Amino acid sequence: MQNGQVIDEFASDVNPHQELDDHIIHLTGITDQQLAQAPDFSEIARTIFELIEDCIFVAHNVKFDANLLAEALFMEGFELRTPRVDTVELAQVFYPTLEQYKLSHLSKVLNLDLAQAHTAIEDARATGQLLFHLMDKIASLPRQTIEMLLTFSDNLLFETELVIRD
């Protein structure tokens, strides 16, 4: 995503070489048969790395996703050093009175598209929409409010403050 537009997408299943537990199958709709035909991570690692190496890595609960991806890429010889932004944390800052911050809940409350939660591509698209929604909200705030928020930005995870600063 760049300047509020999707400029590229990549989606692929990955063969985990083990059976999924029932919870994951129910949550995602992915089956063992589907993954058995998917490529190994080593086959797509370079493509993923090249797509994101010069980007800001944005995720809903970035700590989980970025660490998992960085570890998998490292095992394939790639070191992921992208700045990281967490939309959970941004939503907590700019919508402090919400009852929960699950992507599905935020999508419903903020009227974002999330056709099938817990599928990587749909979650990524909804996270992008959430980021743009939050950026619009930030842009609508008085400069004095943004400056005050930035005084507390050292408490944010990773480089999440970049969204507020820009």
Which functions belong to the PLM regions below?
Residues 82-92:
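A short, structured active-site edge motif that brings together acidic residues
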Residues 44, 92, 126-127:
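Short Asp/Glu-rich motifs
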Residues 41, 89, 123-124:
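Short secondary-structure capping/turn micro-motifs that flank functional sites
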Residues 132-166:
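Acidic two-metal-ion nuclease catalytic site recognized across multiple nuclease folds
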Residues 119-132:
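Acidic, divalent-metal-coordinating active-site segment for phosphoryl/phosphodiester hydrolysis
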Residues 1-83, 96-100, 104-118, 165:
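Conserved non-catalytic scaffold segment of RNase H-like nuclease domains
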